Amino acid sequence: MRADLRRPTGGRRRLALGAACAAALTALLVSAALAATSKTIVLTDARGDVSGTLDLTRVSMQRASDGRLRAALSFADKLTPKALLATSGPPGSACVRIWTAAGADPASMRPDRLACVTARSDDEFRGGVYEVTGPGLPKRLTGASVKLTASATSIVLRFTQSSIGRPQRFRFAIESTRPGCERPACIDTVPDGGTARTFRLR
């Protein structure tokens, strides 16, 4: 039998064209999604604007390759877990304050999520994500990974999108509080002035 060397029929051509269009559309949608996602946001803060170890100098927020959120917090001095413990009063902490509601006003509203670094002991940090629903203490929802960099002046905090409700976007600010002190002078914020930055996830 002679081999069929005829060109593809119109139906085959239409199927091939449809597949090519579908692939192009998928690539376009993926590119659009990546373009909509925020790149790394970096904020700096003046050195020496608060006293103590928890003087923030630089913070960044990004979406890591595994999909988790990655917040890097840099301080003026080296940091140890022991430096967050208090002999009296509240312990020290460094927190990402997160507003997930579309209409939230960070200048007048409390955040609804906190991703925080505290100390479990003299030699171990503790990370967690908390829900803020009222005037009481925040409710711990899940853990967050904490890593101290080689310089010991920066902490990297990683937490999942699901822990903050998978919003399309959120607003955030960073706050560190010196152990044993609740006065405004003991709190360092980035950005300053009660403002926040927007991070887009999708």
Region annotations inferred by a language model:
Residues A33-A35:
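Boundary at the C-terminal end of the N-terminal hydrophobic targeting segment
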Residues G18-V30:
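Bacterial N-terminal signal peptides
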Residues G128-G165:
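Acidic, glycine-rich flexible loop segments
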Residues A150-G194:
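Ser/Thr/Pro-rich, low-complexity mucin-like regions
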Residues M1-R13:
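N-terminal secretory signal peptides that target proteins for export/translocation
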Residues R200-R202:
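Short, solvent-exposed mixed-charge patches
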Residues T37-R126, T177-R183:
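Surface-exposed, glycine/proline- and aromatic-rich loop segments on solvent-exposed faces
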